[in-house]
Amino acid sequence: MGQKINPHGFRLGITTDWKSRWYADKQYAEYVKEDVAIRKLLATGMERAGIAKVEIERTRDRVRVDIHTARPGIVIGRRGAEADRIRSELEKLTGKQVQLNILEVKNAEAEAQLVAQGVAEQLSNRVAFRRAMRKAIQSAMRQPNVKGIRVQCSGRLGGAEMSRSEFYREGRVPLHTLRADIDYGLYEAKTTFGRIGVKVWIYKGDIVGGKRELAANTAAPAGDRPRRERPSRPRRSGATGTTATSTEAGRAATATADAPATEQNQEG
């Protein structure tokens, strides 16, 4: 099941949080429809901004929208003109006062949505899909918090008549482990042969007790580990591995081996 389901939905309430935070009783369907419209509005015309995710939080008379982007200058615009335009359109859509927060993504190579968007842009520019996938994997694995990545492309790859799927993976990507912090991104590339779907999974370590544990940081250096002494084992005989003193033949062999030493001591 972990191979098929969306990693964010699979871990909701365990290691991931909701991207829409509000409560509604009879207006639930209306709010869900508004959230979809808000995200669609921010996605159209903002392809170059590199939007990683959009978080929506509602109160009784206000809607707060947090835009996580790799290029905040494009979203803000010259002297804030683009941000004002987005805010006015959101207020017209929701009918409430909108608080718009634009947050910069520091590490774009470690965000699955931005990696998928970068691969899709290269496919639209006629770059070979294998080269684009390998380049994205190499850039992501150079980041210190990335422990594994998987990139998959599906569609008419290379202009082939029959569509297929290919993926490359490096490092660990434990999709079925609930404590694993897995970032997931999906983007579609529009090519002359049709659309090609790009999916990216990025593993960033385990989350235990609300804290991320990285294997590289938790492992102790080899020189600092205390050495354990191996407990002494009884002498074994034969290919069967039986203890020498546990059989009649073993006891007889032991008595025969000890006899010459006893006789020498008596003669001395």
Swiss-Prot record:
Gene: rpsC
Annotated TM spans: none
One BP annotation, GO: translation
Quaternary context: Part of the 30S ribosomal subunit. Forms a tight complex with proteins S10 and S14.
Region (Disordered): 217-268
SMART domains: KH
Role, per record: Binds the lower part of the 30S subunit head. Binds mRNA in the 70S ribosome, positioning it for translation.
Membership in a protein family: Belongs to the universal ribosomal protein uS3 family.
PROSITE patterns: KH_TYPE_2, RIBOSOMAL_S3
Keywords, ordered alphabetically: Ribonucleoprotein, Ribosomal protein, RNA-binding, rRNA-binding
Protein name: Small ribosomal subunit protein uS3
GO CC annotation terms, alphabetical: cytosolic small ribosomal subunit
Entries under HAMAP family matching the protein: Ribosomal_uS3_B
Sequence ranges assigned to domain KH type-2 in this UniProt record: 38-106
Biased composition range(s): Low complexity: 237-268
Record bears the keyword Ribonucleoprotein: yes
Pfam families assigned: KH_2 (PF07650), Ribosomal_S3_C (PF00189)
GO MF, any single term: rRNA binding
